[in-house]
């Protein structure tokens, strides 16, 4: 089943064709650590986490890089307002960020920080100067010459002339829409030495440098919130492809807005909800479920009712797991009846539908609807029939669901002793199905076991198994 993904560059869904076979290299823009994360950040990070989990479920090796911007105008301003050293600001809010990721069960492969890559950033800028794509102003700041990159605006659809950056630095630029690669030092600000004098990196150059450092000159997915399309990602693309002279990123992926009771989150409205407060009130599993109940490209509105609905739905899922586990513990008592076989076939089709939804631009909302159809079969059929095979299929469906959604980890840690007995019983039932020439179901069971790391070995009249 081909995975397809929406590419902001081109604005269409395209087949996922990776740079390297069965490997996905992904860079997601992380936070600027000057304040607490809000629930919008949480949505972005969880959405990309679900993508990573599904790709891994499908057998891809995923390398995920998510940066930490630890030097920026906002950090300097926060330090000046609070009277604290800028490094103290960075350390405090970095801990808040990493703690949120831990609670949300998000694991990042590489977490580069800007200040650890200053030398590489300087080298990147110098190469742009050498190629004629950047210039040094009298102040010692370095700017990207936007006119030197003809396809500027292709990603965002924004015309360069429409970009208003303010008047402070316009006089020293060739054009008002040129953007800073290196910012000359001002008294009281942190700085690093460079060929152009004391200063610090601009925002956009940081991500280009770090993504190439960890993922190479061409990688598969570059993502972030929809608000980053312009100017951040547009500028990243311009400077990176100007340097390389070729395509840099294959797929640009963006998570849509999160609103608060139909209003945009903003400090002026006083409606920003810190992520740590939401985690404390609702818990990570409810938040993850709620985030993923909507397609990542659809706007999501925060209100108490929607979180309560997510909590109740998650409780129903856990209750279904309890029923399934009880039926499995009872073991197989009889051959499946015709009605049971139909339930089994329905579950198999719903598992396929789950994968079809996830394969079509990671549609978690649609995928979730199929999981709830399986849950309805658990409550409406399996808890009364006590059919072992139906329960096993439902268990596998919910296991795959949880691998992607990450909302019921505590429900999926059986002991090795129990696991061995369950596999023995499943393999025996599969063997009986083979003897009855019910090959479609026996093949499905083999595939389920293989997906769980269990290899089935068939002989003429029996089957055995081992862990792969």
From Swiss-Prot:
A motif ('KMSKS' region) lies at residues 264-268. Its EC number is 6.1.1.16. A motif ('HIGH' region) lies at residues 31-41. Keywords: Aminoacyl-tRNA synthetase, ATP-binding, Cytoplasm, Ligase, Metal-binding, Nucleotide-binding, Protein biosynthesis, Zinc. One of its GO terms (molecular function) is cysteine-tRNA ligase activity. It comes from the Archaea. InterPro entries: Cys-tRNA-ligase, Cys-tRNA-synt_Ia_DALR, Cys-tRNA/MSH_ligase, Rossmann-like_a/b/a_fold, tRNA-synt_1_cat_dom, tRNAsynth_Ia_anticodon-bd. Binds 1 zinc ion per subunit. Zn(2+) binds at residues 29, 207, 232, 236. ATP binds at residue 267. Its cofactor is Zn(2+). One of its GO terms (biological process) is cysteinyl-tRNA aminoacylation. It is found in: Cytoplasm. SUPFAM superfamilies: Anticodon-binding domain of a subclass of class I aminoacyl-tRNA synthetases (SSF47323), Nucleotidylyl transferase (SSF52374). Its main location: cytoplasm. It catalyses: tRNA(Cys) + L-cysteine + ATP = L-cysteinyl-tRNA(Cys) + AMP + diphosphate. SMART domains: DALR_2. Belongs to the class-I aminoacyl-tRNA synthetase family. This is Cysteine--tRNA ligase. The lineage of its organism: Archaea, Thermoproteota, Thermoprotei, Sulfolobales, Sulfolobaceae. The gene is cysS.
């Amino acid at each position: 089943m081909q995975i397809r993904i929406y590419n902001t560059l081109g604005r269409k869904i395209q087949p996922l064709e990776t740079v390297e076979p069965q490997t996905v290299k992904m860079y997601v823009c992380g936070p600027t650590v000057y304040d607490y994360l809000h629930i919008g950040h949480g949505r972005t990070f969880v959405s990309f986490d679900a993508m990573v989990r599904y790709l891994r479920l499908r057998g891809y090796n995923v390398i995920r890089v998510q940066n930490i911007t630890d030097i920026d105008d906002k950090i300097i301003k926060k330090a000046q307002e609070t009277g604290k050293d800028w490094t103290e600001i960075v350390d405090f809010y970095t801990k808040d960020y990493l703690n949120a990721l831990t609670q949300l069960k998000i694991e990042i492969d590489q977490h580069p920080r800007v200040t650890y890559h200053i030398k590489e950033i300087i080298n990147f800028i110098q190469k742009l100067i050498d190629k004629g794509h950047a210039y040094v102003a009298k102040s010692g700041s370095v700017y990207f010459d936007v006119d030197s990159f003809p396809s500027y605006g292709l990603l965002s659809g924004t015309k360069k002339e429409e970009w208003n950056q303010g008047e402070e630095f316009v006089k020293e630029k060739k054009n008002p829409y040129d953007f800073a690669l290196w910012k000359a030092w001002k008294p009281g600000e942190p700085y690093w030495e460079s060929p152009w004098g004391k200063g610090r990196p601009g925002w956009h150059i940081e991500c280009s440098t770090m993504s190439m450092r960890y993922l190479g000159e061409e990688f598969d997915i570059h993502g972030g919130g929809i608000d980053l399309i312009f100017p951040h990602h547009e500028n990243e693309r311009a400077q990176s492809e100007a340097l390389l002279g070729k395509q840099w990123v294959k797929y640009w992926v963006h998570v849509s807005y999160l609103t608060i009771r139909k209003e945009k989150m903003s400090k002026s409205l006083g409606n920003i909800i810190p992520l740590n407060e939401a985690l404390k009130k609702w818990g990570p599993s409810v938040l993850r479920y709620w985030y993923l109940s909507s397609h990542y490209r659809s706007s999501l509105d925060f209100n108490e009712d929607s979180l309560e609905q997510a909590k109740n739905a998650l409780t129903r899922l856990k209750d279904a797991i309890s029923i399934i586990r009880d039926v499995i513990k009872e073991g197989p008592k009889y051959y499946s009846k015709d009605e049971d076989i139909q339930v089994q076939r329905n579950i198999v089709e719903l598992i396929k539908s789950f994968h079809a939804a996830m394969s079509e631009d990671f549609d978690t909302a649609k995928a979730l609807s199929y999981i709830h159809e399986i849950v309805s079969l658990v409550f409406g059929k399996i808890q009364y029939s006590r059919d072992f095979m139906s329960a096993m299929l439902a268990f596998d469906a919910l296991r795959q669901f949880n691998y992607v959604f990450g909302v019921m980890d505590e429900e999926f840690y059986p002991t090795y002793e129990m696991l061995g007995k369950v596999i023995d019983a499943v393999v025996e039932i599969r063997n009986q199905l083979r003897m009855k020439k019910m090959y479609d179901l026996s093949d499905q069971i083999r595939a389920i076991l293989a997906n769980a790391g269990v290899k089935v070995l068939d002989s003429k009249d029996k089957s055995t198994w081992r862990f792969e």
